């Protein structure tokens, strides 16, 4: 019998955690949640099979991003492209690392995740989005939407299918991904920029220990403050509780979380899952009994390390790991 307890579609298991602590500041993890953002692979790390050894970084906007408050690297949102170098499935994922909307865990929630996706034949696009407290909503959402539009508008160039573009996010990056999945548009036909004419809706969604709600009972206070500043409008808070924004058009979703997460409690994932279920959106959720916040791929944890396999099975079951016929 597996040691971890898992929540799967149709089964709800919530265990007492003895209270929620430390929601204002995410704990530092070995993967570098508190480290400065990285946009290229760290030196000395070997690539996994199927990973593109020469990632390409591109700006989200040529000539500067709208709403930029300076010209430093933090003012320049980018995508780092890791193309699947073999057995490409034609599927793409935009990856949003976490970091409480203040930092970006570009290694263990960015590059390492890209390597894992490449190993399945999935091309990865790691998003460096703008952060608080300098930038607030809707800047972050605009960066995420732009990333999805870029991949979709250049799908042929990237050797991916325009209807197989997902978004994956961890922690606060999970909030950004779920916001993109619940606040999308179908494109702006009259836009001067051709990229803005295509849809910003992700075709599927992958969430790792995500921030979902702005409800103080379960929210990560630091993420909310960095995203919205002090004293945000109550209507905006409600609008960005993404469990309240789920509709039948929300994309199919895979979620994993840990019951022992005291920074971002699992109720965030539970609320989103139940909203998906109510809207009859295909969804799968796994709640593991143990494990801290910010675990990434969890390669060193015998129990948690099964979640990438569960995700692989979910993607395969949805036909996303098989290259479509020419």
Question: What do the PLM-derived regions correspond to, one by one?
Answer:
Residues 255-257, 261:
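Short beta-strand/loop motif that positions the catalytic acidic residue
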Residues 82, 256, 266-326:
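C-terminal catalytic histidine-bearing segment of alpha/beta-hydrolase fold enzymes
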Residues 146-223, 237-238, 242:
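Primarily recognizes the serine-hydrolase "nucleophile elbow" in alpha/beta-hydrolase
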Residues 39-87, 91:
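N-terminal cap/lid segment of alpha/beta-hydrolase-fold proteins
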Residues 89-99:
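Short beta-strand element of the alpha/beta-hydrolase
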Residues 20-51, 326:
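Disordered, low-complexity segments in secreted/periplasmic proteins that are enriched in proline
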Residues 105-107, 111-112, 126-162, 298-306:
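Catalytic nucleophile-loop/oxyanion-hole region of alpha/beta-hydrolase
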Residues 97-102, 259:
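Active-site glycine-rich loops that stabilize anionic/oxyanionic intermediates
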């Amino acid at each position: 019998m597996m040691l971890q307890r898992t929540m799967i579609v149709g089964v709800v298991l919530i265990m007492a955690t003895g209270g929620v602590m430390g929601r204002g500041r995410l704990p530092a993890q070995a993967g570098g949640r508190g480290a400065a953002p990285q946009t290229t692979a760290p030196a000395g790390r070997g690539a996994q099979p199927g990973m593109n050894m020469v990632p390409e970084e591109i700006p989200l906007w040529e000539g500067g991003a709208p709403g930029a408050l300076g010209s430093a690297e933090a003012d320049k949102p980018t995508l780092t492209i890791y193309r699947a170098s073999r057995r490409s499935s034609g599927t793409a994922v935009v990856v949003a690392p976490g970091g409480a909307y203040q930092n970006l865990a570009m290694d263990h929630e960015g590059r390492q995740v890209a390597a894992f996706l490449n190993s399945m034949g999935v091309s990865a696009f790691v998003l460096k989005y703008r952060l608080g407290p300098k930038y607030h909503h809707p800047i972050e959402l605009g960066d995420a939407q732009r990333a999805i539009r870029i991949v979709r508008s250049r799908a042929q160039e990237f050797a991916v299918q325009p209807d197989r573009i997902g978004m994956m996010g961890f922690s606060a990056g999970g909030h950004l991904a779920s916001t993109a999945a619940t606040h999308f548009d179908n494109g702006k036909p009259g836009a001067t920029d051709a990229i803005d004419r295509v849809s910003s809706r992700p075709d599927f969604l992958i969430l790792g220990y995500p921030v979902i709600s702005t409800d103080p009972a379960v929210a990560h206070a630091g993420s909310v403050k960095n995203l919205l500043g002090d004293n945000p409008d109550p209507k905006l808070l409600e609008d960005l509780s993404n469990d309240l924004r789920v509709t039948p058009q929300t994309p199919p979703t895979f979620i994993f979380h840990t019951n022992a997460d005291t920074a971002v409690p699992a109720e965030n994932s539970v609320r989103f899952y139940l909203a998906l279920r109510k809207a009859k959106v295909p969804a799968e959720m796994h709640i593991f009994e143990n494990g801290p916040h910010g675990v990434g791929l969890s390669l060193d944890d015998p129990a948690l390390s099964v979640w990438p396999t569960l995700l692989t099975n979910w993607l395969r079951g949805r036909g996303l790991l098989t290259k479509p016929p020419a």
